[in-house]
């Protein structure tokens, strides 16, 4: 459970030279009652871990698809507490690692220590907080470490070499490579230097490197996975769930990791 569980699952994939696929879903989008069903479906479809967004009123890193999902989740009265309660209710039946993505403001209001303790109790394995600068993360990092929860850092293409090295050194679980500039979402044109960026991160990271932001096809997922250890796919997964297209999600995951869809 916790960081050790996430590390073990990802290590198994990388040692077998299999691409890691982490789908993102918004907790509470489609109802909190469906949360565990969706996690189970993604596990059965071939996901390595699940990234679970906590809805927030000012989601600075999210593109329009995920922002809309967040609004639907907020309309369903989704909170950190209700998400953790739902996760804890089926913790013993869940095998796949779960990573929460939230913003620093709701975590600060919840209380760093209480947040880490409750996440651990709910079976959360990792945390992503995209809007906290590395220079201000020590308090929350300490609480997460105490409860064996991986603190996953983001590495941006716009960061300096020195900053990337410091981020890579601190990252736990996996290093989340922001492979495009801007917010999440599909991209009609992907920056060609994404591959160079991912290869550079692979050289300096002691944990798996996953590319995220702007990946909407299995072809693109396979291309980027060739330069790193795998991908995180958010907007496309959220979109397909909203459309009720579970077959589309299954195909996207299977084709992204190089398996034939029957």
UniProtKB/Swiss-Prot annotation:
The active site is at 51 (proton acceptor), 62 (proton acceptor). The alpha subunit is responsible for the aldol cleavage of indoleglycerol phosphate to indole and glyceraldehyde 3-phosphate. It holds the Pfam family Trp_syntA. One of its GO terms (cellular component) is cytosol. It is an enzyme of class 4 (lyase). It comes from Oceanobacillus iheyensis (strain DSM 14371 / CIP 107618 / JCM 11309 / KCTC 3954 / HTE831). The keyword DNA-binding does not apply. Pathway: Amino-acid biosynthesis; L-tryptophan biosynthesis; L-tryptophan from chorismate: step 5/5. Keywords: Amino-acid biosynthesis, Aromatic amino acid biosynthesis, Lyase, Tryptophan biosynthesis. It catalyses: (1S,2R)-1-C-(indol-3-yl)glycerol 3-phosphate + L-serine = D-glyceraldehyde 3-phosphate + L-tryptophan + H2O. Tetramer of two alpha and two beta chains. Its EC number is 4.2.1.20. The keyword Amino-acid biosynthesis applies. This is Tryptophan synthase alpha chain. The gene is trpA. It comes from the Bacteria. Belongs to the TrpA family.
């Amino acid at each position: 459970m916790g960081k050790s569980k996430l590390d073990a699952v990802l290590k198994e994939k990388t040692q077998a030279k299999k691409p890691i696929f982490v789908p993102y879903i918004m907790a509470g989008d489609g109802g909190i009652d469906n949360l565990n069903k969706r996690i189970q479906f993604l596990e059965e479809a071939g996901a390595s871990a699940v990234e679970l967004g906590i809805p927030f009123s000012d989601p600075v890193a999210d593109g329009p698809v995920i922002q809309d999902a967040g609004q639907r989740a907020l309309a369903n009265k989704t909170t950190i507490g209700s998400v953790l309660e739902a996760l804890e209710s089926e913790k013993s039946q869940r095998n796949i690692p779960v990573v929460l993505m939230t913003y620093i403001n709701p975590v600060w209001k919840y209380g760093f220590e209480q947040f880490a303790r409750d996440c651990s109790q709910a079976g959360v394995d990792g945390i992503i907080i995209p809007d906290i600068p590395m220079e201000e993360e020590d308090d929350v990092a300490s609480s997460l470490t105490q409860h064996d929860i991986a603190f996953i850092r983001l590495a941006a293409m716009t960061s300096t070499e020195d900053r990337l090295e410091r981020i890579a050194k601190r990252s736990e679980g996996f290093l989340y490579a922001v492979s495009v500039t801007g917010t999440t979402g599909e991209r009609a044109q992907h920056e060609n230097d994404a591959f160079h960026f991912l290869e550079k991160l692979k050289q300096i990271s002691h944990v798996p490197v996953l590319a995220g932001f702007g990946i909407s096809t299995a072809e693109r997922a396979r291309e980027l996975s060739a330069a790193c250890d795998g991908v995180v796919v958010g907007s496309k997964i959220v979109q397909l769930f909203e459309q009720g297209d579970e077959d589309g999600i299954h195909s996207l995951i299977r084709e992204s990791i190089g398996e034939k869809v029957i």
